Every structure is written in C-alpha cells, then in structure tokens.
Amino acid sequence: MISDILAPGLRVVFCGINPGKSSAHTGFHFAHPGNRFWKVIHQAGFTDRQLRPEEELQLLDTRCGITMLVERPTVQASEVALQELRSGGRELVRKIEEYQPQALAVLGKQAFELAFNQRGAKWGKQAMTIGTTQVWVLPNPSGLNRATLDKLVAAYRELDDALATRGQ
C-alpha cells in the first residue's frame, strides 16, 4: 500500500494516475527507475536536490505533496477502468477540499478528462478550481510517455513559476 503525502498548507499536490508495479512493490511513489518524476520536479525548481523515491516524505519540507487518482497498481495506466477514474476523481476532490493546497497538478491529460468529465482539456492551468485550489494538468513523467525531459521540465516549471508569482 502506498500512502498519500498530504498536509495542510502545501504549494502543490501532484496527483499521479495510479501506482505502477515498482511503486507497489517498494511502497514509494514514482519508484520505477524509468519514471522521471523526481528528476523533473528537481529540475523544475520544486526541490533543491533530486530526491529518491524512498525520500518522498521530504517533499513536505518543500510544501509539495503526492496522491493518486486510483490506488490499484497496474503495469500501464491504460489498464485503469473509467469507473475507477471517476470514483478517484470524487475522492481527490474530497482530499483537496480538506487540505486546500495552492495548486493540484494532475499528471496526465486523459486521466484528468476522464476523472473529471472535462473534454478537450489543454495542458497547464485549467479554468476549474476546487475551492480556492488552482487545477493544473501536466504531462505524466512515466518513462512510457514520449515527452522529452526538457518538455516535462518546462511544463512543471510553468507551475512552479506561477506559484512563485503568487508568493507561494
């Protein structure tokens, strides 16, 4: 079982789709060696050094958190059913209403569209909010995603810069 990393007063909560098999095995988020999450958030400015998956709780020191839409581990996110995503979206709204971070970053456009029934979502900041929490859609850092490291870092940096502009 992989636990959420959440606390009140966070700048951002990164929301993955669901754990991969490596994460399920180790108990840490984004644990597969091919997953670029830890590298991307460091290079985008969220952390002062590249954390390892087993250091995930140190994210709270940077006012960042992690959760997932769906708890069930799979090899590929495409194995997650629509009903699981919709249910996960409702649970995610509950968590965000409870913790009220400045921003929620859903990592994957299709997962966001399905979980929140939002067709035609664009990358970046969304029109919808959850309370006062901004909602962003960022590319998934999975090694299965064809996005280059530079494109991932640029997308995540846009969020970091937007939060810095707001004094967060």
Swiss-Prot record:
Its EC number is 3.2.2.28. GO terms for molecular function: DNA binding; pyrimidine-specific mismatch base pair DNA N-glycosylase activity; uracil DNA N-glycosylase activity. It is found in: Cytoplasm. Keywords: Cytoplasm, DNA damage, DNA excision, DNA repair, DNA-binding, Hydrolase. It comes from the Bacteria. Coiled coil: none annotated. SUPFAM superfamilies: Uracil-DNA glycosylase-like (SSF52141). Its main location: cytoplasm. GO terms for cellular component: cytoplasm. It catalyses: Specifically hydrolyzes mismatched double-stranded DNA and polynucleotides, releasing free uracil. GO terms for biological process: base-excision repair, AP site formation. InterPro entries: MUG/TDG, MUG_bact, Uracil-DNA_glycosylase-like, Uracil-DNA_glycosylase-like_sf. Transmembrane segments: none annotated. Pfam families: UDG. Belongs to the uracil-DNA glycosylase (UDG) superfamily. TDG/mug family. Binds DNA as a monomer. Excises ethenocytosine and uracil, which can arise by alkylation or deamination of cytosine, respectively, from the corresponding mispairs with guanine in ds-DNA. It is capable of hydrolyzing the carbon-nitrogen bond between the sugar-phosphate backbone of the DNA and the mispaired base. The complementary strand guanine functions in substrate recognition. Required for DNA damage lesion repair in stationary-phase cells. This is G/U mismatch-specific DNA glycosylase. It comes from Klebsiella pneumoniae subsp. pneumoniae (strain ATCC 700721 / MGH 78578).
